[in-house]
UniProtKB/Swiss-Prot annotation:
Keywords associated with the record: Cell cycle, Cell division, Cell shape, Cell wall biogenesis/degradation, Cytoplasm, Peptidoglycan synthesis, Pyruvate, Transferase
Protein's UniProt name: UDP-N-acetylglucosamine 1-carboxyvinyltransferase
Enzyme Commission number: 2.5.1.7
Organism: Nitrosospira multiformis (strain ATCC 25196 / NCIMB 11849 / C 71)
Pathway membership: Cell wall biogenesis; peptidoglycan biosynthesis
PANTHER family, alphabetized: UDP-N-ACETYLGLUCOSAMINE 1-CARBOXYVINYLTRANSFERASE
Family: Belongs to the EPSP synthase family. MurA subfamily.
The gene coding this protein: murA
Keyword Protein transport applies: no
Length: 416
């Protein structure tokens, strides 16, 4: 099993080019199921989850081609297999995103209940409830969702909770439904907007993108298009926190500043000097960080996917920070590993109290999920001595060449 070996204590400095957003690319790849024409997707990151999704789509009959420039062509002229098996779904929760488009286009789907990161139940009941409202017949047997419908019908759907993948699944399904679908309490995340913009480019009729009420007028068919995936706001935030925690200076290229207000506000509150343009961000940390309180919530509030990284920043900050996690119930699993590195953290329910210490100590630590693995890498970068991060397959699910990008900033990090 691969691991990362890090010699800490280096001030990071330099330029980083941000990759395409995994959480936008995955549903956009699934959108290829909605048309028999070719969908060309640019800026697709090279990640394990992307590879798994492409393998799954190929198994369903989608022809794919990936070139050296991270451009992916997908043609779903004929869907030969309407099953997403457990063996492929268990490592990636996003595989549930084939359910809506496959059902809308082919009239049937059999999808395994999802796996992925162990950071909460993340139930799919909102997906099922919405599709049933659109006329689908759904049964769950032996760990699989069995769905069928001659043609989906438009419906008024009020989601009980804000769910990103639920919004995406229902939005894709509604593009080919008969009539108008209204999604209330819809997710507003930029990745949802990116998918919607791709669907619109394919001929979908969607209004309210970026609001909590999305209206989709179904059409008979969608067509192919060229689309470029948005930059990854979580990768952007991770590198900004890495630079801030190390007292460094960083310049992000090919990013999207307008998607990062909550993260940038907290970094400035911590003492970072930040300048930015439409597609670039410059951060410089002149003084030790100040502690910042966080409360995760759906976009545009502070993202849960940045909670663990900011916890690392708070471990060495001046003062005490209170971090409240409202999205997932098990997203403090990295705390135990940070405590092995001399962090002072107390957890009670969905709240963590982080008291800043003079410095972290290198240690052997183990990643438990994608963002926790990133936080442990950041901790190793600022710790005294050597840190070994095990189970980094989690990291490879969401960060493209992270050790290469960090090395270019001066980090002493290698894969073993």
């Amino acid at each position: 099993m691969q691991k990362l070996i890090i010699q800490g204590g280096v001030r990071l400095s330099g330029d980083v080019t941000i990759s395409g957003a995994k959480n936008a690319a995955l549903p956009i790849l699934c959108a290829s199921l909605l048309t028999g024409e070719t969908l060309v997707v640019e800026n697709v990151p090279h990640l394990n989850d992307i590879t798994t999704m492409l393998d799954l789509l190929q198994q369903m009959g989608v022809r794919t081609n990936v070139d050296s420039n991270r451009t992916t062509e997908l043609t779903a002229a004929y869907l030969s297999n309407l099953v997403a098996p457990y063996e492929m779904v268990k490592t990636m929760r996003a595989a549930i995103l084939v359910l809506g488009p496959m059902l809308a286009r082919a009239g049937a789907a059999k999808v395994s209940l999802p796996g992925g990161c162990a950071i909460g139940l993340r139930p799919v009941d909102q997906h099922i409830k919405g599709l049933q409202a659109m006329g689908a017949e759904i049964e769950i047997e032996h760990g699989y969702i069995h769905a069928k419908a001659k043609r989906l019908n438009g419906a008024h759907i009020v989601m009980d909770i804000v769910t990103v993948t639920g919004t995406e699944n229902l939005m894709m399904a509604a593009t080919l439904a008969e009539g108008t679908t209204v999604l209330e309490n819809a997710a507003r995340e930029p990745e949802v907007m990116d998918l919607a913009n791709c669907l619109i480019a394919m001929g979908a009729r969607i209004q309210g993108v970026g609001t909590d009420i999305i209206t989709i007028e179904g059409v008979e068919s969608l067509h192919g298009t060229h689309y470029c995936v948005m930059p990854d706001r979580i990768e952007s935030g991770t590198f900004l926190v890495a630079a801030a925690a190390s007292g460094g200076e960083i310049y992000l290229r090919q990013t999207r500043t307008d998607t990062m207000d909550a993260v940038l506000d907290k970094l400035m509150e911590a003492g970072a000097a930040i300048e930015s343009g439409e597609d670039w961000i410059h951060l410089k940390m002149n003084n030790p960080p100040k502690s910042v309180n966080l409360r995760t919530a759906p976009y545009p509030a502070f993202p849960t996917d940045m909670q663990a990284q900011f916890m690392v920043l708070n471990t060495i900050a001046t003062g005490t920070a209170i971090i409240t996690e409202t999205i997932f119930e098990n997203r403090f699993m990295h705390v135990q590993e940070l405590e092995r590195m001399n962090a002072d953290i107390k957890v009670e329910g969905n709240t963590a109290v982080v008291c800043g210490v003079a410095g972290l100590d290198g240690a052997n630590v183990m990643a438990t999920d994608l963002r926790a693995s990133a936080c442990l890498v950041l901790a190793g970068l600022i710790a005294r001595g050597e840190t070994i991060v095990d189970r980094i397959y989690h990291l490879d699910r969401g960060y493209e060449r992270i050790e290469e990008k960090l090395s270019a900033l001066g980090a002493r990090i290698r894969r073993s």
